[in-house]
């Protein structure tokens, strides 16, 4: 797996943005508005999937529910913050000449609320199939102009890592203090800044 890393693709919710709890609350309130009480433990594993897929599991009018939760999320977006090491890490990647992208199941209207210094953004609105299908990653790789083998994918759930493994990207699970692990991860890191250590490690392997 020795190679030079030329790009990093990040998931957004739960990876760069500390927003999972807000997203869960938004879904619960949206379902409740339509008379459906969906427990948190059923919503949480679906965060990161296309919203329409989550809604379809519980209601017959999934688009209406999805749009309502997006509306709640947008109205309360100020409570969601980037993890503290995100901005300096993105700046360091840019300094090193490493291309960056975000691949997210979030809609573009939400992403437009954030000023994020990455080269490319692929939202659920830009593809016909969302994660875990590889399509969003293929689109990002094409935009970045690099092969999958020279790209790292960073995510906080297996839904982010499964398509990365299919494409032979290097998959990295970021924990953010959670006691989690994944068989789909080539590396596991505690925070976003640790991705720089992964890149350095791969560079050392390449020079041996």
From Swiss-Prot:
The active site is at residue 11. Transmembrane segments: none annotated. Keywords: Hydrolase. InterPro entries: HAD-like_hydrolase_sf, HAD-like_sf, HAD-SF_hydro_IA, HAD_2, HAD_sf, PGP-like_dom2. It comes from the Archaea. It holds the Pfam family HAD_2. Its EC number is 3.1.3.-. One of its GO terms (biological process) is DNA repair. Catalyzes the dephosphorylation of the artificial chromogenic substrate p-nitrophenyl phosphate (pNPP). PANTHER family: PHOSPHOGLYCOLATE PHOSPHATASE (PTHR43434:SF1). This is Phosphatase Ta0845. It comes from Thermoplasma acidophilum (strain ATCC 25905 / DSM 1728 / JCM 9062 / NBRC 15155 / AMRC-C165).
């Amino acid at each position: 797996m020795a190679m030079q890393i030329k790009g990093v693709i990040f998931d957004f919710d739960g990876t760069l943005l500390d927003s999972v709890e807000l997203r869960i609350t938004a879904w619960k309130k949206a379902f409740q508005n339509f008379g459906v009480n969906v427990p948190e433990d059923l919503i949480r594993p679906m965060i990161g999937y296309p919203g329409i897929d989550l809604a379809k599991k519980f209601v017959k009018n999934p688009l209406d529910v999805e749009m309502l939760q997006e509306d709640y999320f947008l109205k309360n977006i100020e409570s969601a913050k980037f993890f503290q090491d995100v901005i300096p890490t993105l700046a360091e990647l840019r300094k090193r000449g490493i291309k960056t992208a975000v691949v997210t199941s979030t809609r573009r209207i939400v992403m437009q609320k954030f000023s994020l210094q990455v080269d490319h953004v692929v939202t659920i609105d830009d593809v016909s199939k969302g994660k875990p299908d590889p399509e969003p990653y293929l689109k990002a790789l094409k935009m970045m102009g690099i092969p999958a083998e020279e790209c790292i994918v960073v995510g906080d759930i297996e839904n982010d890592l499964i398509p990365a493994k299919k494409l032979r990207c290097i998959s990295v699970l970021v924990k953010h203090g959670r006691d989690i692990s994944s068989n789909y991860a080539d590396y596991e890191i505690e925070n976003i800044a640790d991705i720089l250590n992964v890149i350095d490690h791969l560079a050392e392997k390449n020079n041996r």
